[in-house]
Amino acid sequence: MALLQISEPGLTAAPHQRRLAAGIDLGTTNSLVATVRSGKAQTLADEQLADEQLIAGEQLIAGEQLIAGQQLINEKQRDLLPSVVHYHPQGIDVGWKARNLAALDPVNTISSVKRMMGRSLADIVQRYPNLPYQFHASENGLPMIQTARGLVNPVQVSAEILKTLAQRAQAALAGELDGVVITVPAYFDDAQRQGTKDAARLAGLHVLRLLNEPTAAAIAYGLDSGQEGVIAVYDLGGGTFDISILRLSRGVFEVLATGGDSALGGDDFDHLLADWLREQAGVATRDDHGIQRQLLDTAIAAKIALSEAETAVVSVAGWQGEVTREQLESLIAPLVKRTLMACRRALKDAGVTADEILEVVMVGGSTRVPLVREQVGQFFGRTPLTSIDPDKVVAIGAAIQADILVGNKPDSDMLLLDVIPLSLGLETMGGLVEKVIPRNTTIPAARAQEFTTFKDGQSAMMIHVLQGERELVKDCRSLARFTLRGLPPLPAGGAHIRVTFQVDADGLLSVTAMEKSTGVEASIQVKPSYGLSDDEIANMIKDSMANAQSDITARKLAEQQVDAARVLESLQGALAEDAALLSEQESAAIAQAVALLQQQMQGSDPQAIEAATKALDAQTQDFAARRMDASIRRALAGHSVDEV
């Protein structure tokens, strides 16, 4: 069965006609494009790269000064496109040329733009205070960067990278692409995913699907091998870390749990080493972005060299010294430990132990660091898989998926099931959260629930969409609010509103509310301006477990208070219309029961509120029966038996 069994209009392949598709790994540090040729997925090299730039990687170290922070390229790096864009009055450079201009013109050279995708300007400034760019805020608070070619936003910068990769693929395939699969971190939120789609649209690409990076790696590894069981995908890239626990069974590929940290990656290794080099060299870099870039370039080159050698000689800003693998490992050890803590949480979420993991797939260039491989191997108790280049494995998996979705493999038996990381729900009366789609539900998914009005004659309803695991609104994350208007003025509980939550294959959420009798409808697509980090998601899950008992107690109390308020409001309306049906003694008894209920509602004992509500209900049963009789008499007045 092909993934989702959905064919895009106009993309059904004719017999013997192969459609051109590509998989794109849009990375924080480097990006790649891959395709399937002769049945094999392979990354595509930049054949236009100048031969004089191709020198052995070892020459990056050994004390040679890199002129203006120039990054020299070895043969193996032809496939990589640095995710760097340089804006200058004459045009735009992308990739290695832009990368080599970063030290000379840091203000106009934008790198690691993926970290800015879908985030507000305030969030970016808080998370990354040392960025050299001149930021401006758009009307909705999103970041704009001042460049020599005017203001640009992260979506436009990403579009330049995608455009360059698409041109490489089209040159290699000698034709226009029919569609692409683009990979994103598993914890990209709605805004970040939508931003990626918008960038692809700007680049003129048809997106077949966004695919989680760890999932793409598992396609490249696990499904090719035909194994069944539980595997872990450890993805440590330049800017993000993801851990995914996946189950492979009879062609079904299911994500059991995901975790990680959207603000942790190899870039952080580089910055730690650059800071250490700055201290050793005694260089002041606060106001010199060129020296900052040079330090970072030297740190990157040293890190690469230390994956093969025990020591590396470095030279920066007139200072020359030596850095050892042991020194690097002491700097990055706390960060590696953070990744293992995320692995532990993911295993717990998946309900499996490390012993049950069949294979560990390593993804991302940062997994070449010996300490990372050693620590991951010790944690899972097995040697990680590294046979596919960790820089290329995600792009290869995306290419395999693109080949299927474009229609070249209609008989594929691959089925992919991703999950949402946190429950989605609505606010109900009393500040309670009604979960509509629970956490770890496979996507795409759609769920609907019916809600009703609280007050008589209610003509509108506020829909408050929430994300989280807690029972009360104040403890969950607000995603969006919208209002459904035009409800028929019925008694409380008379209107029936069907609310549908729909999460598509890319993880984007749409919420629709419809009143069933009139068909009035309102909807919203949730695009938060910035998202949660993986640590914040993990903390939300942890808090829900730590506060489970108190949350249940608080929910019971709120539910009883809402029920009591509903009874009191209904009784108030009935007394306003038909108080004459009661004797003075009955009125006094009801008033006493009302006072008792109101008193109990101020307390914190849900059982006492429930008992007082039942007592008031019992006290008003005769009154309710008389009202019904009176209503029937009024309805029959003036009519004969035959008319009835």
From Swiss-Prot:
InterPro entries: ATPase_NBD, Heat_shock_70_CS, HscA_NBD, HSP70_C_sf, HSP70_peptide-bd_sf, Hsp_70_fam, ISC_FeS_clus_asmbl_HscA. Gene3D superfamilies: 1.20.1270.10, 3.30.420.40, Actin, Chain A, domain 4, Substrate Binding Domain Of DNAk, Chain A, domain 1. Keywords: ATP-binding, Chaperone, Nucleotide-binding. Pfam families: HSP70. CDD domains: ASKHA_NBD_HSP70_HscA. PROSITE patterns: HSP70_1 (PS00297), HSP70_2 (PS00329), HSP70_3 (PS01036). The keyword Transport does not apply. One of its GO terms (biological process) is iron-sulfur cluster assembly. GO terms for molecular function: ATP binding; ATP hydrolysis activity; ATP-dependent protein folding chaperone; unfolded protein binding. Chaperone involved in the maturation of iron-sulfur cluster-containing proteins. Has a low intrinsic ATPase activity which is markedly stimulated by HscB. Involved in the maturation of IscU. Belongs to the heat shock protein 70 family. This is Chaperone protein HscA.
